[in-house]
Amino acid sequence: MRVARANWKREQPRLDPTKLVFIDETGTSTNMTRPRGRCRRGKRLVAKVPHGHWKTTTFVAGLRQDGMTAPFVVDAPMDGEIFLTYLERCLAPTLSPGEIVTMDNLPAHKVAGVRETIEATGARLWLLPPYSPDLNPIEQSFAKLKAHLRKAGERSIPALWDQIGTVVRGFTPE
């Protein structure tokens, strides 16, 4: 693993950042709340936190130098079939020859047809070294996305999906 990480870091300076597309997925749910709050000294902070049943969805997207690309929300956990559908319908139409699609080693990313779908567009597929989420910059974008979702506190799936769309449109290079 150490050798794979060293090889990855050695190759990075040779890559054209405008050709990189980082892909990952994250879970979102209707029970997301801020982990901390503020109130006047000596006063008790009172906030509503959902209990009971909530819905979880999966958000998958790509990150380019100029922002998020090909966002996709699905009301199910990620599996190979869903990921392949995402590639064919959302990501592949946005890819150009020479681009490098980079993703982690999730089993859903290794199903038959993934590499072929990406390479059919003229792009290449690179897998990150195992256990290396720190090498995928989309992780920081997802942390920011989740912070916005916690702040919004949406409690229904349609409202959550609308909020995801609003936040994703705000991801720009600045």
Language model feature labels by segment:
Residues M1-E174:
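Short functional hotspots at interaction and active-site rims
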